[in-house]
Amino acid sequence: MELSESTKKALKAIPLMRTKAGPRDGDSWVQRLKEEYEALIAFINNNKAADLDWFRLESNSDGTRWFGKCWHYHNMLRYEFDVEFDIPVTYPTTAPEIALPELDGKTAKMYRGGRICLSDHFKPLWARNVPKFGIAQAFSLGLGPWLAVEVPDLVDRGMIQPKTA
């Protein structure tokens, strides 16, 4: 996966994780979650400062289930989707599988349940950066580019409609 200079710059502005811990790792997981939230807050603030705000995310109390909204603008129209994912027990070795359930079956670049396909480009990059990458990097390098490619195609094929006020 070759990254553009603007992508590299945006990625460098997201804090990296220091703790290699998953949901079964007790206090280490609590520390990892703190790092995840700090990175997400920095990523969202950077996006807002650049007028590139495109998602909201929250988790359950133990940080194992995440949900929210993401959106993409195409031809001056906003397309908004529910986004969700679970943290795998093997996290951070295994990247989360981000899902947009309402798009299930509408594109070939998706698995059952609306999980977006990231295997060819993103997963090797994730594997090389364990444990430094986290949720913010998964959104920056996974979901964001996926939306940029798939939303225009889905619109052109008449598969999705813009969000109405």
Swiss-Prot record:
Keywords in alphabetical order: Ubl conjugation pathway
Record-level Gene Ontology MF annotations: ubiquitin conjugating enzyme binding; UFM1 conjugating enzyme activity
GO cellular component, one term: cytoplasm
InterPro entries from the UniProt entry: UBQ-conjugating_enzyme/RWD (IPR016135), Ufc1 (IPR014806)
Gene3D superfamilies cross-referenced by the UniProt entry: Ubiquitin Conjugating Enzyme
Transmembrane regions: none
Positions of the catalytic residues: 117 (glycyl thioester intermediate)
GO terms of biological process kind: protein K69-linked ufmylation
Keyword flag Ribosomal protein: no
Family assignment from sequence similarity: Belongs to the ubiquitin-conjugating enzyme family. UFC1 subfamily.
Role: E2-like enzyme which forms an intermediate with UFM1 via a thioester linkage.
Alphabetized PANTHER family for the sequence: UBIQUITIN-FOLD MODIFIER-CONJUGATING ENZYME 1
Designated name of the protein: Ubiquitin-fold modifier-conjugating enzyme 1
Organism: Brugia malayi
